[in-house]
């Protein structure tokens, strides 16, 4: 019996890993907790999970962001939006026949390394049932920005406190409000631009200049 490979996640890295597994003739399966390929690039207005914002675009040009063996369409702008990126990832998965190897709505809950070097993977299947399987190889492609980290500050704050993971787009309730954004990374800068469209004033607090 051939050795098995488990790929966790069907985002940009996961489908690339799957394509290479397929071309190498490996026996593999992809476990994806959502119902689409694309990972964080699949927009969903619901909170409680990581995804792009309503107006997210690439911050690097398409020529620097595309797969070397599957270029982005010529009619895409230099900086595609998230809808176009999702279409691109879906096209990639179809082109390389990856869909047949993906188990959607399968959430990995725990992975344990065995004494013989194999991996025991626990997951919930698409019916919510607990399952587990042994794989000889494991490829973790689920990213590392799915669990929000909240800073701890002394004192009390009575206004609305929102983590960037929960942000999907500016709401009407932001209009004419004062907004403080903690941090100056990609998420912070994206949200600052969106907030500035409707808020009274937007401040950014950063650890270093």
Name each model feature, range by range:
Residues 77-142, 146:
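Feature captures the FAD/FMN-dependent oxidoreductase FAD-binding
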Residues 4, 136, 177:
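Conserved acidic residues
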Residues 3-30, 189-195:
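N-terminal Rossmann-like FAD-binding beta1-loop-alpha1 element of flavoenzymes
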Residues 56-59, 97, 152-157:
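Short, conserved catalytic or adaptor-binding loops enriched in Gly and charged residues
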Residues 75-77, 81-85, 101, 140-198, ...:
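Glycine-rich dinucleotide-binding loop and its adjacent helix/turn
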């Amino acid at each position: 019996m051939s050795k098995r490979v488990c790929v966790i996640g069907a985002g940009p890295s996961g489908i690339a890993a799957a394509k290479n597994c397929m071309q190498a003739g490996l026996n593999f399966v992809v476990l994806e907790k959502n119902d689409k390929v694309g990972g964080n690039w699949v927009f969903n207005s619901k909170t409680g999970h990581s995804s792009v914002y309503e107006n997210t675009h690439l911050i690097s040009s398409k020529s620097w962001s595309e797969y070397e063996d599957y270029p982005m369409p010529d009619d895409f702008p230099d900086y595609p939006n998230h809808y176009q990126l999702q279409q691109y990832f879906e096209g990639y998965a179809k082109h390389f026949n990856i869909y047949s190897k993906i188990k959607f709505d399968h959430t990995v809950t725990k992975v344990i390394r065995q004494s013989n070097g194999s991996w025991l993977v626990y997951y919930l299947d698409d019916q919510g049932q607990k399952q587990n399987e042994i794989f000889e190889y494991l490829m973790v492609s689920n990213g590392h920005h799915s669990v929000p980290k909240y800073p701890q500050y002394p004192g009390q704050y009575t206004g609305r406190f929102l983590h960037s993971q929960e942000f999907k787009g500016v709401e009407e309730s932001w209009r004419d409000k004062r907004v403080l954004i903690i941090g100056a990374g990609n998420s912070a800068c994206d949200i600052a631009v969106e907030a500035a469209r409707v808020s009274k004033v937007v401040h950014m607090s950063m650890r270093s200049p």
